[in-house]
Amino acid sequence: MEYILHYIWKYRLYSAIDLRTTENEKIEIIDTGIENKDSGPDFFNAKVIIEGTLWAGSVEIHEKASDWIRHGHVTDPLYDNVILHIVEEDDKVIYRSNQTRIPQLILPIPEKVLDNIDWLLNNESPLACRERLPAIDALSLIHISEPTRQAEI
């Protein structure tokens, strides 16, 4: 499920209405940040407002809050700039190596995302979107194929 949380965060597929941390602090997501493909936190340069204070830094995502400890982040200074810990399950309060608490957000997985995952996993079609093709108008299809046609010329 962690990879699904990454996807939801990266593409902002969550409801931003009345978001609250696990400590019931009002939070507003300004920028989800840049996805990190190397070691260290999952996203860099994120910006959030928590209880009226703007925070800028990194975001780490785990299925369970306790994964923070299991992965050794609690003693790793690379994670001291984490401003938000996104989890599916809040089973532990987490801290940086200097013992300051890290705000946590339980990111709910939207029903539509779960439905799409279920559909993709249970569909045997080699073209996952074939049923939706008739709904796309011809002009859109021409526009989509234009870069390919330009490359052929």
Predicted regions and their residues:
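N-terminal ordered "arm"
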Residues: 7-66, 73, 79
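Low-complexity, highly charged intrinsically disordered N-terminal segments
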Residues: 2-6
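Single conserved hydrophobic/aromatic residue that forms the stacking wall/gate
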Residues: 142-153
